[in-house]
Amino acid sequence: MKEKYTVEKVYENIKVEDGIYKLSIKGEFEVRPGQFYLLRAWDIEPTLSRPISIYDADDEKISFLYSVVGKGTEILSKLKSGDEIKITGPLGNGFNVKRISGKVAIVCGGIGVAPMVYLAKNLKNCNVDFYAGFKTVSKTVDNVEKYVKELKLSTEDGSIGHKGYVTDNFKPEEYDYVLCCGPEIMMYKVVKMCEQKNVPVYISMEKKMACGIGACLVCTCKTKGGRRRACKEGPVFLGSELILND
């Protein structure tokens, strides 16, 4: 699937909760879970488009979940149905779902849930448990239960699910594969837990990006084989290859 640049119309742009929005575009898009698009709704400022993960896709539309964290995403959050938006993608390697089988744990935190919901939807032949951690109750995983065997929530304030961190009750030895996305400190812990139990883990890296096509090297990640670009060789990497910060 080759990336392409197109000008589309916003179908809907819904506020999911404080600071979190879901933007949808009508059309049929050939995408893989874990891939992303560059979104842009301005001409000059800010300079860069914004890399946003695919939250859902079907025969009718594609949806993106994003957090408002700066000028670019603030502009995106103000878009209305019918407004123009420029998109480039799909970008990145994504998850190869055909190679994942058996009992699977998806472990994610914060806005890192965005690519993992669409991943869960596509793991049709797997037995999936979905671990999601937040600071407080979140609506971003409201639709994931229909895709998984069990949804296991954790919140730091105890507003829903386990009070604490998403890794507290996670036992990697119970799974054939672990798939993870979220804050780097969380991913570091998940990788270490999986290494101790000899369970393969795939990590979807969240990195700042500029060009999205591998030219600028802004999004490089440290790996045991040297630096790799999250936008080209990633964002999905085998956890044992990465050098993460704890």
From Swiss-Prot:
Domain FAD-binding FR-type: 3-97
Known cofactor(s): [2Fe-2S] cluster; FAD
Gene3D superfamilies cross-referenced by the UniProt entry: Dihydroorotate dehydrogenase, electron transfer subunit (2.10.240.10), Nucleotide-binding domain of ferredoxin-NADP reductase (FNR) module (3.40.50.80), Translation factors (2.40.30.10)
Keywords from the named record: 2Fe-2S, Electron transport, FAD, Flavoprotein, Iron, Iron-sulfur, Metal-binding, Pyrimidine biosynthesis, Transport
Free-text cofactor note: Binds 1 [2Fe-2S] cluster per subunit. Binds 1 FAD per subunit.
Top-level taxon of origin: Bacteria
Tagged with keyword Flavoprotein: yes
Residues involved in FAD binding: R50, P51, I52, S53, G72, T73
Metabolic or biological pathway, per its Swiss-Prot or TrEMBL entry: Pyrimidine metabolism; UMP biosynthesis via de novo pathway; orotate from (S)-dihydroorotate (NAD(+) route): step 1/1
GO biological process: 'de novo' UMP biosynthetic process
Binding site for [2Fe-2S] cluster: C211, C216, C219, C231
Entry GO MF terms: 2 iron, 2 sulfur cluster binding; electron transfer activity; flavin adenine dinucleotide binding; metal ion binding; oxidoreductase activity
Family named by the database record: Belongs to the PyrK family.
Function per UniProt: Responsible for channeling the electrons from the oxidation of dihydroorotate from the FMN redox center in the PyrD type B subunit to the ultimate electron acceptor NAD(+).
Protein name, as recorded: Dihydroorotate dehydrogenase B (NAD(+)), electron transfer subunit
Name of the gene: pyrK
